[in-house]
Each structure stands twice: as structure tokens, then as C-alpha cells.
Amino acid sequence: MSKTPLTEAVSAADSQGRFLSSTELQVAFGRFRQATSGLQAAKSLTDNAQRLIDGAANAFYSKFPYTTTTPGANFASTAQGKAKCSRDIGYYLRMVTYCLVAGGTGPIDEYLIAGIDEINRSFDLSPSWYVEALKYIKANHGLSGDAASEANSYIDYAINALS
């Protein structure tokens, strides 16, 4: 079992033969509210994924128009290139939804950051392209309140990792 502040509090209380304190219970309720917001955000992003991906790709093409005219397998000058671009944007969006469900940055840390520099160099991809796509998603996801705060924190984390 992975350690979290909640599992550590339970373990400490159990080893001391006591019930959780009111402070520890408040932390648990706070985590529950955060988890609920994260799950709401993940569901909304998933339900709107195609719209967000398409819009992010168009924002990407507008900011970096050379990507749609430069020939090559790693550019969006062909239908296949545009499909790859959308696939990659979808990958970043999926990582954000995984973080929202997990309640931490682990999915981005393990699946995105770990090899992103090597992948981008190998395939001549610019991280700034995906930063622009993530900025579009953040500005257009349609979330509000705690769900928006949760989603934005992981989107910002991914943007910072790529910057």
C-alpha cells in the first residue's frame, strides 16, 4: 500500500491504540473533498476530450503555423501529421486526468517527465507546442470552482515540466 498522509495518520493512531484525532479527521474530510473535485474534473475533461484536443491543436497551429507547412513525419503538414499531433495532445490531457484521479503528480512524473526530453529530441518535437496546447485546454475546459482549481494545478504542473 502506498503511503499518504491519511494512511500515515491511521498507522500512527493504530500503533498508539487511539482513534483518529479531530485534526486528523478534518484532514481526511479535506482530502475527500479534494478527491471529489478531482474526479469531477477528470470526468468533465474526459467527456470533453475531443473538443479540447481539437481546439488545442488549432491553437497550436495558429501559434506555430510552420508546423502545418513543414514537410516531415513529425509535423502537421499532412492528415497523418495532424492525427499524430492530436494523439500527442490527447496523451498530455490523459496524464492530467490520471493525476486528478490519483490525487497527485505521479502519472505526470512517471510517464511524462521521465522520458519527455529524450522523446522530444529523438522526434524533433518542441515542448513549446504542447505548452501552447495545455494553455488552451486550461483556458477552455469549462470547469469552475474546486474542480477547476484541481485541474489547473495539474495542467500548470505539466506546463512547468515542459518549460
Swiss-Prot record:
Contains one covalently linked phycocyanobilin chromophore. It is a peripheral membrane protein. Pfam families: Phycobilisome. It is found in: Cellular thylakoid membrane. GO terms for cellular component: phycobilisome; plasma membrane-derived thylakoid membrane. GO terms for biological process: photosynthesis. InterPro entries: Globin-like_sf, Phycobilisome_asu/bsu, Phycobilisome_asu/bsu_sf, Phycocyanin_a. (2R,3E)-phycocyanobilin binds at C85. Keywords: Antenna complex, Bile pigment, Chromophore, Electron transport, Membrane, Photosynthesis, Phycobilisome, Thylakoid, Transport. Its main location: membrane. PANTHER family: C-PHYCOCYANIN ALPHA SUBUNIT, PHYCOBILISOME 32.1 KDA LINKER POLYPEPTIDE, PHYCOCYANIN-ASSOCIATED, ROD 2-RELATED. Light-harvesting photosynthetic bile pigment-protein from the phycobiliprotein complex (phycobilisome, PBS). Phycocyanin is the major phycobiliprotein in the PBS rod. Belongs to the phycobiliprotein family. Heterodimer of an alpha and a beta subunit, which further assembles into trimers and the trimers into hexamers. This is C-phycocyanin alpha subunit. It comes from Synechocystis sp. (strain PCC 6701). The gene is cpcA.
